[in-house]
Amino acid sequence: QAPEHDPIPLLGFMAAATTRIGLGATFSISHAHPFYAARLWATLDHLTRGRAAWNVVTTLNHNQSANYGETLRPSDERYERAHEFIEVCRKLWDSWEPDAVVMDREAGVFADPKKVHRIEHEGRFFKSRGPLNVIRSPQHGPAILQAGTSPKGRSFAARYADAIFAIQPNIAGARAYYDDIKRGTVEEGRPAEACKILFGIQPILGRTDAEAREKAEHHNALVPLEGGLAILSGHLDFDLSQIPLDALMAERTEAQLQRMQTRYRTLTGELLTLREVAQRHGQSVGLVQMVGTASAVADQMEDYFDKVGGDGFMLSPIYSPGAIEEFVDEVVPELQRRGRYRRDYTGTTQRDHLMQED
């Protein structure tokens, strides 16, 4: 998939052009050190005036690891390392006490050295002396986002995440996922509302329902089979070229393929071939497509939201630029008229926005 420019530098430009919206990016912890990450995200939190959000991921693809001259770690080890990584970042963000900076010109003192501490961390995967060389940021570190689906990913989100992205193809699965994450968050000693759950959808709008359906059909037909296979192979970390295209996924014994078959069978109610799964994955990666006029899409969002109890949605545009602008201009006003979406911000930071009740 290319081009995929590094999103981190872009956040600085976006911060200069905006004042309130939260700004987030994905940053893998698999090929970095916590000190670098803690410094990077504290700096971004300052640049954005407290609007930074870090989507924490563990690399799950052998090809990505090979780019760094490394081999992919086993899943258990990746998550053990991830827990320690975030704990070290937290210690570094804590290394400056809230009132450490005094800026006493007369005494020539910028910060009280008694309130800036080494962390002296030495764990299984990392060592770091500290303190961080960036002062405490507006949010005391960025908001943490995550997209865990496996038991280990869900546990990680329940412990650390301010919000979690989820792809659930139907109401029953989404409700079970929602309840599981909220239960896990409480078990970690946090309030259930501390981790917001955002369900992924792909809205496709038209001036009429017929126009929207035509647009959806056109979009879905544009996806080449080879592209869908490549994306699916990357997401599964499995070479699909060795499998016949018309083989039923349900007949495969590989764990990765069984999970993907379950997702798409839940979405469609059908047993699908590799060809069909790859085509659908290339179209929406399993996201629910909500198709119709602005009013119809708002109806579908309300129905999903009310039945699941989720905290919000993650939008996946079918084209860019344009699709997000259409949603903001057409669906958001409709949701506001129904009292389902805020008309203003009540806070200034990303965490404020996530905690705001609409």
Question: What label would you give each PLM region?
Answer:
Residues 1-358:
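N-terminal glycine-rich cofactor-binding segment that shapes the pocket for flavin-like pterin cofactors
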